[in-house]
Curated annotation (Swiss-Prot):
Keyword Ribonucleoprotein: yes
MF-aspect GO terms: structural constituent of ribosome
Protein name (Swiss-Prot/TrEMBL): Small ribosomal subunit protein uS14m
Major localisation: mitochondrion
Cited Pfam families: Ribosomal_S14
Record gene name: RPS14
One example of a Gene Ontology biological process annotation: translation
Compartments, record wording: Mitochondrion
């Protein structure tokens, strides 16, 4: 199940990167009050015709080993329990249990 979710998320990331500039351009045209309203409406229509998954709002950080969407470290892209297990085994370079 996690492979399916991770592959779906990966496809969304690729689509979002592909359409990022076009989406930002259309949004800027829509929000510009100096442009005529028909031109803004035309760009709003073009924005609505872009693929749904091309928005970064639909991208979700997921654990690369379990596919879990919550409590995932952005830097390592690992769920906190998996991170703890890998760190305690010494599988993550430079990570050790803190003590003071």
């Amino acid at each position: 199940m996690s492979e399916k979710q991770n592959s779906r998320d990966h496809k969304r990331r690729l689509l979002a990167a592909k359409f990022e500039l076009r989406r930002k351009l259309y949004k800027a045209f829509c929000k510009d009050p100096d442009l005529p309203s028909d031109m803004r409406d035309k760009h709003r229509y073009k924005l609505s015709k872009l693929p749904r998954n091309s928005s970064f709002a639909r991208v979700r950080n997921r654990c690369i080993s379990t596919g879990r969407p919550r409590s995932v470290s952005e830097f390592f892209r690992i769920y906190r329990i998996v991170f703890r297990g890998l760190a305690s085994r010494g599988s993550l370079m430079g990570i050790k249990k803190s003590s003071w």
